[in-house]
């Protein structure tokens, strides 16, 4: 397992946090996602099943901007 912190723009409220957490944790290979209102997400994932580019893509598909 690997844990990374991504910077996320566009998080405005608790609903954004909840929705983004759900989107990430539903992704195959993601063990946990701690999304913070301040625009950070700590994500623990299995590198053999998902990569950082896929995590960023899912975040962007949900309407947010993400960078490492």
From Swiss-Prot:
Pfam families on file: HMA (PF00403)
As one GO molecular function, the record gives:
metal ion binding
Provide the alphabetized UniProt keywords. Answer: Metal-binding
Residues that coordinate or bind a metal cation: 13, 16
Q: Which residues form the HMA domain?
A: 2-67
**Matches recorded under InterPro entries:** Heavy-metal-associated_CS, HMA_dom, HMA_dom_sf
Which residues does UniProt assign to the signal peptide?
Answer: none
Q: Does the keyword Thylakoid apply?
A: no
Query: Does the entry feature the keyword Transport, yes or no?
Result: no
Q: Which domain of life is it from?
A: Bacteria
Disulfide bridge positions per record = none
Query: Which protein are we looking at?
Result: Uncharacterized protein HI_0291
């Amino acid at each position: 397992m690997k844990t990374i912190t991504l910077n996320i723009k566009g998080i405005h409220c608790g609903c954004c946090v909840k929705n983004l957490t759900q989107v990430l944790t539903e992704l195959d290979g993601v063990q946990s996602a701690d999304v913070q209102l301040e625009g950070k997400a700590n994500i623990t994932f299995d590198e053999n099943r998902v990569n950082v580019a896929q995590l960023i893509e899912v975040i962007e598909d949900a309407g947010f901007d993400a960078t490492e």
